[in-house]
Regions:
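PLP-dependent aminotransferase class I/II
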Residues: 1-119
Length: 119
């Protein structure tokens, strides 16, 4: 999937053998589509997605009271990278028993979405 424009994809580290439970996808800010648009399209094609519970946790509803009172946390820096992760990143589910056909379906579905968005 390295040739797919508009996405940031994970790569295993040298000398590693990861056991993927999900495949993380980040949509670049200049991709021409949003995380939600891609995620909704994949869901419509029976590919399950989940937003990543990470990024700027202070913007999650669980922190509403802390934000209102300004107590119980501290912020270092502008958190720009964490905002990007919060707004642009999601998972597609994978597991060791997936067949090559299943993987190719996911890849081709993502490529079709991006090709359609370029028109």
């Amino acid at each position: 999937m390295k040739d797919i424009e508009g996405l940031i994809l994970p790569e295993p580290q040298k000398n590693s053998n990861p056991s993927w439970f999900g495949f993380l996808i980040s949509v670049k800010e200049d991709a021409g589509f949003t995380r939600n648009e891609l995620s909704e399209y994949l869901e419509s094609k029976k590919i399950q997605t989940r937003n990543l519970f990470a990024g700027n946790l202070l913007k999650h509803p669980a922190f509403n009271e802390m934000r209102q009172t300004g107590e119980g946390y501290r912020v270092v820096g502008d958190l720009k990278g964490t905002d990007f992760i919060l707004n642009n990143t999601f998972w597609i589910g994978v597991y060791p028993g997936m067949t090559e056909e299943m993987l190719q379906y996911m890849i081709s579905t993502i490529k079709k979405f991006i090709a359609f968005r370029k028109v």
